[in-house]
């Protein structure tokens, strides 16, 4: 529909930029490059799908790395990106969930929801243990320091370790999931969410 034209252009730019800038060999090798002690530690927390969760976290970081590059290098397309972010990340239902007591119990689903939307102006970095540390690890304000998909993977790996360190001793109910939700699987991630400070920021020029 015409009203979704800008969103469609923004999404096409996002996906095209992935093809140009992302190294998908990292994903092919991910089962070999995730250290065994990390997956073993996750199993002790009842998490059997740690590689899938790390892959989702990588996607979050990589999306923002890629989008930041395009946002800065092609200013004429910024409005298309903003339209895409408004549709996928500034939805009123997301705002409401972030401001409520939903996703405030330390679980994989809670962390993934809060991480995916961590750039939202309604983000509460105190909602989950370690969420502020995860935000700092991502370093959205200096995301352009990440020069490769492998750099993004290493950040995602550290984020995963922070999540694991804050989960209850046993979380068997999360072991059957894939660490993602509909928003994660269907939509791209914001490319510029902050300035490296403790306060979430929206994409700006």
What are these regions (language model features)?
Residues 1-205:
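Short, functionally important secondary-structure microenvironments
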């Amino acid at each position: 529909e015409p009203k979704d034209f800008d969103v469609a252009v923004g999404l096409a730019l996002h996906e095209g930029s992935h093809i140009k800038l992302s190294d998908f060999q990292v994903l092919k090798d991910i089962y070999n490059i995730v250290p065994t002690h990390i997956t073993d530690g996750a199993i002790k927390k009842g998490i059997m799908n740690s590689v899938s969760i790390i892959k989702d976290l990588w996607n979050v970081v990589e999306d923002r790395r890629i989008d930041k590059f395009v946002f800065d290098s092609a200013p004429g397309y910024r409005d298309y990106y903003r339209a895409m972010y408004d549709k996928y990340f500034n939805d009123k239902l997301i705002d409401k969930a972030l401001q409520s007591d939903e996703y405030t119990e330390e679980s994989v689903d809670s962390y993934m929801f809060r991480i995916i939307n961590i750039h939202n102006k309604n983000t509460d970095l105190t909602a989950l243990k370690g969420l502020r540390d995860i935000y700092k690890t991502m370093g959205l304000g200096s995301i352009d320091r990440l020069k490769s998909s492998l750099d993004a993977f290493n950040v995602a790996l550290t984020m995963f370790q922070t999540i694991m360190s804050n989960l209850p001793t046993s979380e068997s109910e999360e072991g059957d999931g894939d660490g993602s939700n509909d928003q994660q699987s269907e939509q791209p991630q914001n490319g510029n969410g902050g300035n490296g400070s403790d306060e979430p920021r929206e994409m700006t020029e």
